[in-house]
Amino acid sequence: MEFCVLFGGASFEHEISIVSAIALKGVLKDRIKYFIFLDENHYFYLIEESNMHSKYFAQIKEKKLPPLILTHNGLLKNSFLGAKIIELPLVINLVHGGDGEDGKLASLLEFYRIAFIGPRVEASVLSYNKYLTKLYAKDLGVKALDYVLLNEKNRANALDLIGFNFPFIVKPSNAGSSLGVNVVKEEKELIYALDSAFEYSKEVLIEPFIQGVKEYNLAGCKIKKGFCFSYVEEPNKQEFLDFKQKYLDFSRTKAPKANLSNALEEQLKENFKKLYNDLFDGAIIRCDFFVIENEVYLNEINPIPGSLANYLFDDFKTTLENLAQSLPKTPKIQVKNSYLLQIQKNK
């Protein structure tokens, strides 16, 4: 099976997506037929496999290429010899952050009936907004940390609104999990943390920062009527991972398996199933969990994890191919114009 990797985007995580695509190339190798780069101005470019390295993008050489136009079933390439349609194999949406994870590209691909692996519109909207994610989890019976939601109108009253003690964590509601995130240990650090978070989002979440919490990551997808899970990862424990630590090191090919009980692993999987539901059909997602006093809490849903979290799967290629056979179908609407014909008949 062949794939097309779509990456880049007008996003704060633009570089993350490039690194993610380069890493996935090393995993899937000759199964990737096309690499399609989306720049910050929303132009599409076809990138040769030989140019899929960081130096090429650091020098912005793709600007010398002719831009492509997304259309039904593929991309339109104009040249002196006329227009040509590049028919796309199954697309992997690997655009992190805005454009890729907020639903814009999902809408565009669905509109042009281009088959793709990735979250659909509704799943993107719910998972990209951390506040909506909490509401979604609560509705499904999945625990999440307490929080306060701030906007520009009430940020001046932040300390009055926060109902928990220092330290707490300040994060943008709409952004990657490490962008604009700060741990606030005392009052004088709050202004900087809020300024940083509001750079990335119009709304900001504040959560209690709990020392010594256990963290576990689990990726997976739905195959037909069952689930395919990765193994559980326990991330390296630091106060929190910054942007570079979390995203720009894709050199690892495997992550260490977590040492946890079978009972806890089953709890994580059951919570994952609830969150995946039917909403995330067609996507490989990663759910990041906290375990606090033997209770499982959702930290976040990553609808397009870096390099699709391939390093967490024992057989990623088979998982991807099985998912490709389990994509949700969009029913085609048959337009018959019967009402219009009846109007004409009655005239």
Curated annotation (Swiss-Prot):
Cell wall formation. GO terms for cellular component: cytoplasm. Pathway: Cell wall biogenesis; peptidoglycan biosynthesis. Its main location: cytoplasm. It is found in: Cytoplasm. It catalyses: 2 D-alanine + ATP = D-alanyl-D-alanine + ADP + phosphate + H(+). It comes from the Bacteria. Residues 134-332 form the ATP-grasp domain. Disulfide bonds: none annotated. Binds 2 magnesium or manganese ions per subunit. The gene is ddl. Its cofactor is Mg(2+); Mn(2+). It comes from Helicobacter pylori (strain J99 / ATCC 700824). Keywords: ATP-binding, Cell shape, Cell wall biogenesis/degradation, Cytoplasm, Ligase, Magnesium, Manganese, Metal-binding, Nucleotide-binding, Peptidoglycan synthesis. This is D-alanine--D-alanine ligase. Mg(2+) 1 binds at D288, E300. Belongs to the D-alanine--D-alanine ligase family. GO terms for molecular function: ATP binding; D-alanine-D-alanine ligase activity; metal ion binding. Mg(2+) 2 binds at E300, N302.
